[in-house]
Structures are given as C-alpha cells and as structure tokens.
Amino acid sequence: IMLPNHAPLIVAEQFGTLESLYPNRIDLGLGRAPGTDPQTSFALRRDPSRANAFPNEVVELLNYFHPQDNQKIHAIPGMDLDIPVWILGSSFFGAQLAAKLGLPYAFAAHFAPTHMYTALDIYRKEFQPSQFLEKPYAMLCMNACAAESTEEAEYLFTTLQQSFTQLIRNDRKLTPPPIESMEQYWNPYEASQVSQMLKVSAVGDFAKVKEEIEEILRKTEVDELMFTGVIIRQDSALLRLSQK
C-alpha cells in the first residue's frame, strides 16, 4: 500500500477485514511513493505533501491495530489484530524508519537496486527492538525468470526489459510480448539504464537461477526473498511458478 494515497483508518479496516477472512495469511507493506503517474495520483485525490507525513501516518496506522490508552478512534475490524506491517523502500529513508520503529523492512531491488547493500546495512545497524520485533528482519524483492534453457529465459525476460524501456521513454503501454533481441528496440542509453534497474535479476535455466538466487542470499543475508516475474505467456508463467 502506498500510504499517502489512502487514509490510514481505511487501510486498517481493509486489512483487518482481510485478516479476519484469512487469519495469519496477511502481511501489510507500506510505502511512501505515489506508485503511479501524476494523473492517476490526482484521480486518487493524493496530496503531494502527504509523503512528508508518512512516518506519522505509519504510527497512526499501527495504533489502529494496537490501540493506545484513551484512543478515541478504532478500526473495526482491525483493532487488536496481529497483522505484520513492513516498511517498503529503495532508499535510506525507509531503512531508517523501519529501524526506528522496530518493523521489518522490504527493499525494492527489483527496480531500484542502487542502494541495496547500504540500505540493508543501515537498517540492521540502527534497528531498535520493539513490540513487533526483537531483532532486524529484512526481505529483498528481486526479478526472476527461469526456463528450460537460458536462451528461452532471456527471450521471456525481454517483456520486462521492454516495459522498463517504455517507462524511461514515458511511453507506457500494455505489457508487450517477448521479442528475439533487444538490440533494435533500445538505444545504448536506454540499455544502460534498464540494465542497472534490473541488475538484481536471476535469469536462465533452473540451475542457473537457483545459483544466482543463492548468491544473492549469501551477499545480502536477508531473511526472505520476494520474486516478481513478468511473463506474458500464461503457459510459460504457470510452468515457471510450478518449478521448485
């Protein structure tokens, strides 16, 4: 949830509803970015200045789940439910906030890996134990695209590469089908930018992807991994998800 787009009370009640329907299966991740283009942000009635209030709104939301003494407003459902709340981020700000509040931290390496190691280090060094966690707990989100062969995986991965190129061009469209080669699609600048944005990606046959994932775990020592994979062919996507 990009919290500046929503009222904390509404988020608490919505996730309280989900937790009531599916106990112990719901986590809530909170970010401060708009998460969309300016036009959509405006349609959501987003106030650009609300990003500055993000730390206070996180605390407000936590208090709806765990009410303070003499608190007048309550989330129903939501109150007294144990819903894990994560701080999402790709910069030092989120790492420091998660550490200060003693919350788990999820780093968005799937599109903004530049500060990955430093942000995780800051989070761990500055972490303050809380009612939620006794010690730091971190997750890394990364891209993964596995196939029977590395060639097929690289072919399928061009869908995501094209999408990120469109983002750089400010020309976002529907998810494109894969293409045989990116050489004719992007220019050198775009290739460099997209490659940096997608740097934390495991692409290849199943053995290669497994090896690359294990390497990321060794380097980051995160507690959990979350994978994202944009595969436009349903049969291929289902196959990839079914592989261990």
What are these regions (language model features)?
Residues 149, 235-243:
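Short glycine/threonine-rich loop-to-helix capping motif typified by GTGT followed
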Residues 1-8, 79-89, 147, 197-206:
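Active-site mouth loops of central-metabolism enzymes
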Residues 48-74, 115-222:
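An alpha-helical appendage that flanks or caps ligand/catalytic pockets
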Residues 25-29, 84-86, 104-106, 137-139, ...:
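Structural preference for beta-strand elements that scaffold enzyme active sites
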Residues 93-114, 119-120, 124:
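A conserved active-site cap/scaffold subdomain adjacent to cofactor or substrate pockets
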Residues 1-3, 31-35, 90, 110, ...:
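Active-site beta-loop-alpha junctions enriched in small/polar residues
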Residues 4-66, 105, 113:
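Flexible, glycine-rich active-site loops centered on histidine and acidic residues
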Residues 51-104:
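Aromatic- and glycine-enriched pocket-lining scaffold segments that form the walls
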